[in-house]
Each structure stands twice: as structure tokens, then as C-alpha cells.
Amino acid sequence: VLIDQDALNDVQLIPCTGLRSVVEQLAQGQCDAAVVPIENSVEGGVTATLDALWSHPELCIQRALVLPIQHALLGSGPLSRVTEVLSHPQALAQCSGWLAQHLPDALQLPTSSTAEAARMVAGSPFRAAIASKTAAREHGLDELAFPVNDVAGNRTRFLLLRRGERSEHGDVASLAFSLHRNAPGALLEALACLAQRGLNMSRIESRPSKRELGEYVFFVDVDLPAAPSTALADLIAQLQPLCEHLAHFGAYPSSDLSGC
């Protein structure tokens, strides 16, 4: 859907082994664009994507799109014979209640993606995958149960990533930063910059810096005014001296198709 919205023609899909690999391929110039999940309404932020973005602040977000997520249990044998369930860790977590009720003794095995899980279970009478109905058609699998996600309104926000110049105009801007010091009021001082400029923070998420226990990187989404303004540039200028590192992934349009 993101590809269609941005009118990307003659798209060639490149197989990758995980979300970090997807971002790395883009950063290394092996592809022109990448689509990654960033946040789920049930399980929260997708940590692999967040960590990969922090490693590649040169990338920019071109568009965001929220889509409804409905998982199916797919396999080649009957549900009664399933002893192993494969899927991406996020999908397994989003279906944990259903699995506990219907397959309490099945071993849950994480994979790099739901599509990879579907490929791995094809032909096995005792393995099943949590994936989309589309994956069933692509890999010749039967639909053993649908839907299997615990929350009916399950939604995921996806990002279209590109290399190149960042936009300063859009519905939302995404930033990530680390602070000079872990001290009382340091984070409050940084976030106060948004309030002082009348900007709404629609999301904040923290990830370990991976350097020291208790040291964090903060990911922030900021709602931007509809009318053109210097609000984003002014915010970044005010934040810069407060941060050890500040990554600006650009401003971009954001759409929600989960209600369609």
C-alpha cells in the first residue's frame, strides 16, 4: 500500500533476513526504499526497527501508514496435530492468548518474519505458522484458524524509508536523541522545548543506549501544524545543545487505513 501511494514504479522486491537487514540494505545503497513496521497497537514499538534507525540517522522517513492486522494460523496438517508454532516474535505476542487457549502445549518458535514462518512450515504436518491469508496462497498452506490475534482492533504503523534529503513539512516529524547526562530534569528540559513551541508529542519511546545500564535513547514523534512554519527547525535548534546526539528523520504525511 505504501508503494502504491508513493507511485513507485517497476518495484523489485529484495529478500532480507530480518528488519535490521532491511534497514542495512537501504543504508548501504542496495535498494532505493524500504518498508518497516515501527509500532503496534498491542505490543508497542518494534525494537529492531528503532535500534536500526538509531544506527542510521542518515535515513529519512517519507511516509507513514497505519494498517489493520489480522493473523491466521496456517499449516499443512490438521490443527489437532500441531506441536510447533512459528512466527515473528511480535506476531507470537499478539496471538499469545489464543495460543494459550487453543494450543497450550505447542512450542513457539520465533522467525525473522511471518512470511519466513509460512515458508518454513510448508509440507509439515505438525508445524503451523502465524501469518497473513496471503501467505497461505503463496506457500500452498491451509487456513487452520482465523483470526487468531487477541485484540480485534490490532493495528500496525509502517514507515517508508528512503535515503536523501529530509522534508521539513508534513503531518508528523520523527526525532531520536540521547542526553548529555543522566540527571534529574534532563529529559524534562528536552521535552519542555515542545511545549514551549505549542507542539504535541504524539509518541515517546525509550531504548537502551547499549553503552551503560540506565542510559537511554529517546524516540519522539511530533505533530506539526498544518500551515507552513519554522516550528520544526526552531525545535531542532533548541534541542541540539541539550542532546549528546540528535537524529532527525524528517517530516512526512501519515495516513490511517485501519478503519477502511
Outline where the language-model segments fall:
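Domain-level signature for soluble enzymes in the chorismate/prephenate branch of the shikimate pathway
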Residues: 1-260
